[in-house]
Amino acid sequence: MTSNVRTIGSMGLQIWLRPDHEALGLAAPAITTSGYVPPIDTFASMPQTLWAEDWPADDRPLTVAYFCGALDVPWPTTEDLPVYAQRCRQRAREEAVNFLDHLVGVHLPGAVTETGFAWHLLAGANGERGGEALATQHLSVNVDPSDRYVLSIPGTDEYRLRPDESGFDNLVLAGDWTDSGLNSGCIEAAVLSGLQAANVIVGRGRYHRIRGLYLP
C-alpha cells in the first residue's frame, strides 16, 4: 500500500477574532466552503468550539475561522530533517500571511482593510501584526510521514488495506487512509473505517449495522 498510495503535505490555520460573524461579513455563524485559491482553499467557521475555551473577558473571541489546504513540498527529501521541517514551517507561515493579507476577504470581508488583513481584530495577538500576530494563533504544518494527507488517486483503491487486512493477529486498522468504501481523506471516511474496525474487534461482520452507498 505504501508503494502505490500517494500522499501530500498539508497545512492548517486557525484564527480567533473578537467580532462576531455578522460584523465579519459572514452570512451565517457556521459556514464551510472549499475550492478557493490554493494552497489554502478550504474554510470553515467553527464558533461551536468556543464554549470549551477559556479566554480573558476583555479579549474574548466570538468567531473561530479555520483554513486548510495542501502544502506541496518534496518528499522524500535529502535535507536534514530539522532543516526540512523548518523550511516547510517558514513556507507555511509565508503562505498564511499572504492569504490573510490578500485573499481572506472573500470569506471574511469585515476582516480586511485597504492595506490588508485587520490584524488588530485577532484575539490574543497583543497588538502584533503579520508573522508576529500569526505566531499567537494556530498554524499546523503536516509534513512528517505519518501526518501527510492520503490522496484519492484514480486506480489506487485496490492498494488500500481494509480494517481487517493488516496481516497480523490482533492488529486492526482504522483511518481515512484504509479501504473503507469511501476512500477519501475526510471525517466521514474515518468514521466508516472506525465502525468497520470496531465490528472486526468484537467479531461481527465488517458491515454490521453500517448503512450507506459507499460500501464496496
PLM regions and their residue ranges:
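Juxtamembrane helix-loop transition sites at the ends of transmembrane segments
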Residues: Q196-A197, I210
